[in-house]
A protein has these predicted regions:
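Acidic (Asp/Glu) carboxylate-rich active-site/surface patches
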Residues: 1-35, 39-177
């Protein structure tokens, strides 16, 4: 069913083999300068929709890997999430941007977009806009592909943001995403 591939790759295989593979980015790989953006949560009822982005270059990417930063779906306890968040904030020169939309605000905003993918694209573009304000010379942004690539490109254009954008499935394998 839905999510089976991710369950096998990120939960079952690591439990059986004791290893967690990150196919897109291997340990020690040089991290080119980029923004990584992704979202978590539902927003509509159970809790906030959080869209976050971080700037990573080779040094910051190495620091994030050393902390054990990974796809949040692989983090099994809230104490580990808090520990990672604290560690990320302590990385020298870390630059990040968050958009957190609680259920009430989510339900107010959603009718403006009439479509979850357009809403997510607005959130991703807002995070990229915040990051560009902090690191104007960053050459590219990497986002998990959650819709037709044009949806996020249109949201960036609406904010007059001209940055090279790469969208791909399983972008969470990149330490910045």
């Amino acid at each position: 069913g839905k999510g089976t591939d991710e369950f096998v790759e990120f939960i079952l295989e690591p439990q059986v083999t004791g290893l967690l593979s990150a196919p897109e980015e291997e340990e020690g790989e040089v991290c080119p300068a980029h923004f990584g953006i992704d979202e978590s949560g539902k927003g509509d009822y159970f809790g906030p929709l959080v869209i976050a982005g971080v700037y990573a270059d080779a040094r910051i990417g190495a620091a994030l890997r050393k902390l054990g930063v990974c796809d949040s779906k692989l983090v099994s306890t809230s104490s580990r999430i808090r520990s990672l968040a604290e560690g990320i904030r302590k990385v020298p020169d870390i630059r990040f941007h968050l958009v957190s939309i609680g259920p009430e605000r989510y339900n107010q905003l959603y009718p403006e977009f009439k479509n979850l993918n357009r809403f997510l694209a607005w959130g991703h573009a807002t995070v990229i806009e915040g990051l560009v304000g902090k690191v104007p010379d960053c050459p590219m942004a990497l986002s998990d592909q959650f819709a037709n690539p044009f949806v996020l490109k249109r949201a960036l254009a609406a904010k007059k943001l001209a940055i090279r954008l790469e969208q791909r499935t399983k972008a969470e394998s990149d330490v910045a995403v």
